[in-house]
A protein has these predicted regions:
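Catalytic nucleophile-elbow at a beta strand-turn-alpha helix junction centered on a G-D-S/GDSL motif
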Residues: 1-11
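C-terminal accessory helical subdomains adjacent to catalytic cores in phosphodiester-
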Residues: 11-31, 38, 44-57, 62-170
Length: 170
């Protein structure tokens, strides 16, 4: 699996998934979306040993206009987009969210949702936060599936989790 993502928090989250599922996931952090092109994706993948079963995932926030159009131009990639931001996925582990929300409000709502999130910092998860995320994945998946893809709020991160679950069952 190849996961391209823009932020450090996403990298830390995917590293947690890689350790939990014990699956070969290559994480390619691209800080800015402006440089994501089909050619760049292929160049990055060429630096790794590839198999015919490899999948490409793009984990990006949709808080900037035109991001979605840029991502859709990358062939054979599964979009794991969050609107407005990655923290929505974390929030869905703790609570339902159906109405439109701004990025700052998602983070504030996450911090207020449960005591383990009170001191949430981007790009790091405490042991308790990791345990909570792994234990409540199923709940978050169901909540995410109930949202309209690419709209605010929504997240497609559950698609990666479902494929990892399938991979583990093989």
């Amino acid at each position: 699996f190849f996961v391209f993502c823009e932020g450090e928090t996403e990298v830390v989250y995917v590293e947690m998934l890689r350790a939990h599922f014990r699956c070969p996931i290559h994480i390619i952090a691209k800080k800015t979306l402006l440089n994501i092109t089909p050619a760049l994706v292929e160049r990055c993948k060429e630096t790794y040993l590839q198999t015919k079963d490899d999948r490409t995932f793009l984990m990006y926030d949709l808080d900037v206009p035109s991001v979605l159009e840029r991502l859709k131009k990358i062939p054979d990639a599964t979009l794991l987009c969050s609107n407005p931001c990655f923290e929505l996925w974390l929030l869905l582990h703790a609570t339902e969210r159906k109405s439109e929300i701004k990025t700052d409000d998602v983070v504030n709502e996450l911090k207020k949702s449960l005591s383990i999130w009170k001191n949430y910092k981007k790009s790091e998860f405490t042991k308790d936060q990791q345990t909570f995320l792994l234990s409540n994945m199923g709940i978050a998946i169901n909540r995410a599936k109930g949202l309209k893809e690419f709209q605010n709020p929504s997240t497609g991160i559950y698609k990666l989790i479902e494929l990892l679950n399938e991979e583990v069952r093989k």
